[in-house]
From Swiss-Prot:
Cell location: Cytoplasm
Keywords, sorted A to Z: Aminoacyl-tRNA synthetase, ATP-binding, Cytoplasm, Ligase, Nucleotide-binding, Protein biosynthesis
Protein name: Histidine--tRNA ligase
HAMAP family per UniProt: His_tRNA_synth
GO cellular component: cytoplasm
InterPro entries hit by this protein: aa-tRNA-synth_II, aa-tRNA-synth_II/BPL/LPL, Anticodon-bd, Anticodon-bd_dom_sf, His-tRNA-ligase, HisRS-like_core, HisRS/HisZ, HisRS_anticodon
Catalytic activity: tRNA(His) + L-histidine + ATP = L-histidyl-tRNA(His) + AMP + diphosphate + H(+)
GO-annotated biological processes: histidyl-tRNA aminoacylation
Spans through the membrane: none
EC identifiers of the protein: 6.1.1.21
Species, as recorded: Stenotrophomonas maltophilia (strain K279a)
Any one GO molecular function term: ATP binding
Length: 464
């Protein structure tokens, strides 16, 4: 007999956890749509030569290739060592680039899309790291140009999503890559690849600490003078406290910009984002400047975002993204700038569960169980269930008569809030008895008013 087991690096949930996960997906989708984003789905696998625009490197080592058994046998016979034709997507950005380039003349720009699908990476399986996981992305793609105003709107989307998820206080930290590039240029760190390497080291500041970054930058491979490294560390230590302080920090930076045009541009862009965020109604307690935010991916060119939970910094980033200049350069001659974010929901859910922050979420999608007292009551139980479902109540029927205590136990274990009972006495009076397991109380209500009464109870519990 084969031992049942799940593959390492996957997140398989029991029904009550799956319901909580699904509700988080629903909240994210609802907020994406409120801001006018359109749904897109792409195939789980892409053509290998389309997906892997860069040969070799860490990305290719983590890609899962797809090959039929027939193709595998043919390759073995012929000695063909070329890459399989298909590969599983490792993020949603590359498929988006292919999608926009392929459908460029059918889409309306700026193109606002959201995508919530699983992606696959062959990482080493360990706690909190997954090989299969959900990403929930939004992007606004322009043609030739895209206003920085969209950067502010994306920040407002982040705020709306995590406000409704109600998983605790959070902070949206933002920066602009142009600030860092301009500042480094003023220190003489202007070479393209060298500057990107420094940015990647700075991005490790929160995880590895200032001493590690200092030692790396003065050491072999960088050899930046200690005095300049201290200036870099002082720059990336900047954090704003409130909206007015954020604008003041930018004003100070602008005054010290000297001849750096790129730094001035970054200041102007970030200032406009801050002003529009305030107009969008995002409270100043929800965001701050953090000049250490660089984002490891090299294609970010302007605004960058990192979102963290205030009371659980150990969880790390729960949402990140930024501005890029040319999404589909590998697939199209058109310039397609954009701005977007991604929520890695599988990892976030796992971290929240580990931190005990999922416990308060209602446990079942079934709202009512119609109990069965005896065989003769089956038609009445089915009629009550029909009425409840017609009234919008998710309802399960007990199909075999059992002791009422066991039916209560079943409902409690399954996370069902209401148990509806209709014995001979209740039927004779045209009422049903309802046991509310959440409030631990029982009441009677007319059969005609049952569904509306339960709807009111459910709505009231949402407000509590």
């Amino acid at each position: 007999m084969i031992k049942p087991r799940t593959p390492p690096g996957t997140l398989e949930l029991l029904p009550r956890e799956q319901i909580a996960f699904q509700r988080m997906l629903d909240v994210i989708r609802r907020n994406y749509e409120r801001f006018g984003f359109l749904p897109v789905e792409t195939p789980v696998f892409e053509l290998s030569d389309v997906l892997l625009t860069k040969s070799g490197g860490e990305t290719e080592r983590q890609v899962y290739f797809v090959q039929s058994t027939g193709a595998l046998a043919n390759a073995a016979e012929s000695g063909d060592r070329s890459l399989p034709e298909m590969a599983l997507r490792f993020d949603l950005t590359v498929p988006l680039a292919r999608y926009v380039a392929e459908h460029e003349h059918e889409l309306t720009f700026p193109f606002r899309r959201y995508q919530m699908q699983r992606v696959y990476r062959g990482e080493r399986a360990q706690r909190g790291r997954f090989r299969e996981f959900y990403q929930c992305d939004i992007d606004v793609i322009g043609k030739d140009s895209l206003s920085v105003r969209y950067d502010a709107e994306v920040l407002a989307v982040i705020h709306a999503v995590f406000s409704e998820l109600r998983i605790g206080d959070f902070s949206i930290q933002l920066n602009n890559r142009k600030l860092m590039r301009g500042f480094f240029e003023s220190l003489g760190v202007a070479e393209g690849e060298r500057q990107l390497a420094v940015l990647r080291e700075v991005d490790k500041l929160d995880k590895r600490g200032a001493d590690y970054v200092r030692e790396t930058l003065v050491g072999e491979g960088f050899e930046i003078p200690a005095e300049q490294v201290e200036k870099i560390l002082a720059f990336v230590a900047v954090r704003s406290q409130g909206h007015a302080d954020a604008l003041a920090q930018l004003a100070t930076l602008e005054a010290d910009a000297g001849s750096s045009e790129i730094l001035r541009t970054g200041v102007a862009e970030l200032r406009e984002v801050l002003q529009l965020v305030q107009a969008l109604g995002v409270p100043e307690t929800a965001y701050c400047l953090n000049f250490s935010i660089a984002r490891g991916l090299d294609y970010y060119t302007g605004t960058v975002y990192e979102t963290t939970l205030t009371d659980h910094p150990q969880i790390g980033s729960i949402c990140s993204g930024g501005r890029y200049e040319d999404l589909a350069s590998h697939y199209s001659k058109s310039k397609l700038p954009g701005v977007g974010i991604s929520i890695g929901l599988s990892r976030l859910f796992w971290q929240l569960r580990e931190a005990g922050l999922i416990d308060g979420i209602e446990g079942s999608s079934v709202q009512a169980l119609v109990a069965l007292m005896d065989e003769q009551g089956m038609p009445q139980s089915l009629d009550i269930a029909r009425r409840l479902r017609a009234g919008g109540i998710n309802t399960e029927v007990q199909m075999e008569p059992k002791k009422i205590g066991k039916q209560f136990q079943y409902a409690a274990k399954a996370g069902i809030r209401f148990v509806v009972l209709a014995g001979e006495d209740e039927l004779a009076r045209g009422v049903v008895a309802v046991k509310d397991l959440l409030r631990e109380q029982q009441f009677e209500v007319s059969r005609d008013g049952l569904a509306s009464t339960l709807q009111v109870e459910l709505e009231q519990s949402k407000v509590m």
